[in-house]
A protein has these predicted regions:
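TRNA-binding/sensing appendages of the translation machinery
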Residues: 27-53
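Anionic-ligand anchoring segments at beta-strand to alpha-helix junctions in alpha/beta enzyme folds, i.e.
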Residues: 44-72
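Glycine-rich, highly charged phosphate/nucleotide-binding loops
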Residues: 69-87
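Internal, well-ordered alpha/beta segment that forms a basic, Gly-enriched binding/recognition surface
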Residues: 90-91, 95-187
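A charged, amphipathic alpha-helical module
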Residues: 1-31, 143, 152-215
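Short, solvent-exposed loop/turn segments at secondary-structure junctions
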Residues: 39-41, 58-60, 103, 132-133
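Conserved beta-strand termini and adjacent loop/short-helix elements that scaffold enzyme active sites
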Residues: 36, 55-57, 128-130
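Domain-level signal for soluble alpha/beta catalytic cores
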Residues: 30-31, 66, 92-93
Length: 215
């Protein structure tokens, strides 16, 4: 992780979805996998050879074109994402992994799949059916869904290694980054906090929109 004195660097990374570190990872031959919801296990999208990008639409203020396709009644998040996609802001994506959770993000991702929006001939969209109950049947269903709609497509489309060894490596990196962020967050608990809430959230957000091995 970079030192906190580089906060301006982190802030700049949040100005565009296709930021400096995303471009660097793409230049190294890695695949960019977009997602929008915490129901999508971030760590699975960070397997060796690819990296996850939680989609945002920085500085989008008026999603006029997206409203034509979606509706003014749809929340601004989904419309802003689609507006940015129509502007070409997500052309770096190699895939978009959706979840059957929030309706508006489902509609946005369906538009990505049905319309020729992302200028990448190999781009694809897939949806995972997420259970909302915690029982043994739900666990089995969720595991089957992640295998069929996340791991298998990554392996079949882009040759990503989905072995147990690769999964453990991705989990190790994810846990390392999470531990560092938790340690930074602990500074907020001091009697005289040495980091502001704003600074912490900039760092946290960067960890979700940049390749973790580069931050």
């Amino acid at each position: 992780m970079r030192d906190l004195k580089h906060l301006i660097y982190f802030e700049n990374l949040l100005q565009e979805a296709n930021n400096e570190l995303v471009q660097q990872a793409k230049a190294e031959g890695k695949f960019a996998i977009g997602y929008t919801c915490y129901f999508m296990p971030e760590v699975l999208l960070d397997l060796p050879g690819c990296f996850s990008v939680r989609l945002r639409a920085p500085r989008c203020s008026s999603p006029d074109i997206a409203t034509y396709y979606m509706s003014a009644r749809v929340c601004h998040y989904g419309r802003s994402l689609f507006e940015r996609a129509l502007e070409g802001g997500y052309n770096f994506l190699d895939a978009q992994f959706g979840t059957e959770t929030c309706t508006v993000t489902c509609r946005f991702q369906e538009h990505l799949g049905y319309m020729d929006v992302i200028q990448n001939p190999d781009f694809f969209v897939t949806f995972t059916d997420v259970p909302f109950k915690k029982n043994q049947n739900s666990i089995v269903h969720y595991e089957d869904q992640l295998q069929a709609h996340v791991l298998d497509p990554m392996h079949e489309k882009y040759g990503i290694d989905i072995s147990d060894e690769a999964l453990m490596k991705a989990i190790e990196l994810h846990n390392e980054v999470s531990a560092v962020i938790n340690e930074i967050g602990d500074y907020r608990k001091l009697d005289n906090p040495t980091i502001t809430g704003y600074e912490f959230h900039v760092i946290q957000l960067c960890s979700q929109v940049c390749p973790k091995d580069l931050i």
